[in-house]
A protein has these predicted regions:
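Terminal transmembrane helical module of multi-pass membrane proteins
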Residues: 116-160
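Alpha-helical transmembrane segments of polytopic membrane proteins
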Residues: 35-49, 98-106, 120-124, 142-151
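N-terminal topogenic module of multi-pass integral membrane proteins
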Residues: 1-63
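Juxtamembrane "helix-exit" motif on the non-cytosolic side of transmembrane helices
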Residues: 57-62, 82-90, 115, 131-138, ...
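Membrane-proximal helix-loop-helix units in multi-pass membrane proteins
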Residues: 67-124
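Juxtamembrane loop-transmembrane helix junctions in multi-pass integral membrane proteins
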Residues: 31-33, 64, 89-97, 135-142
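Hydrophobic alpha-helical segments of membrane proteins, primarily the transmembrane helices
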Residues: 4, 64-74, 148
Length: 160
């Protein structure tokens, strides 16, 4: 049930952001930087809710040897959520914390699947095929769709 609530929360946020921006953003996680500074807390609440709703199931379903990857993936997502609220003297540093958290989250979640449910990595096939058709370099929303594959594969893993 917690996973379904997390999916709904993230889905609603994604739909709202697409409506606000008028198109699919280059990255869901970077869309927070298009939100007015005084409202970025919404992003933090959403991602923390997703983290806290997913963590029990995610860690419980994962083999003991790879539970640290689930923890790192959730921690990375929490960093992505918290980065907009951290006051740095330099906006670039804030974005760097955001990017590192996103990379840790994505990498750990997918490495976890390699060891626990490798068939879910097949979800990357349509992404890769479309990328070659569309040309990865010219594909403005490549990160967005990569994030969607990571979230989808992780949510499906938690649901099965």
């Amino acid at each position: 049930m917690n996973i379904l609530i997390a999916i709904i929360i993230l889905l609603v946020y994604t739909i709202v952001i697409i409506k606000i921006e008028g198109s699919i953003p280059p990255s869901l996680s970077a869309s927070v930087f298009n939100i007015p500074t005084n409202k970025r807390w919404i992003w933090t609440v959403i991602l923390f809710a997703v983290c806290f709703l997913c963590v029990p199931t995610y860690i419980e379903k994962t083999s003991e040897n790879t539970q640290f990857l689930a923890f790192l993936a959730i921690s990375g997502l929490a960093f992505v959520g918290a980065a907009p609220l951290v006051k740095f003297s330099d906006d670039e540093m804030q974005f760097t914390v955001h990017k590192v958290g996103a990379i840790v989250c994505a990498a750990c979640s997918q490495i976890l699947l390699v060891f626990n449910c490798p068939w879910l990595l097949l979800l990357w096939i349509p992404f890769i095929i479309y990328g070659f058709i569309k040309d990865f370099k010219a594909w403005r929303t490549i990160v967005f769709w990569g994030e969607m594959v990571c979230f989808t594969s992780t949510f499906v893993y938690c649901l099965i």
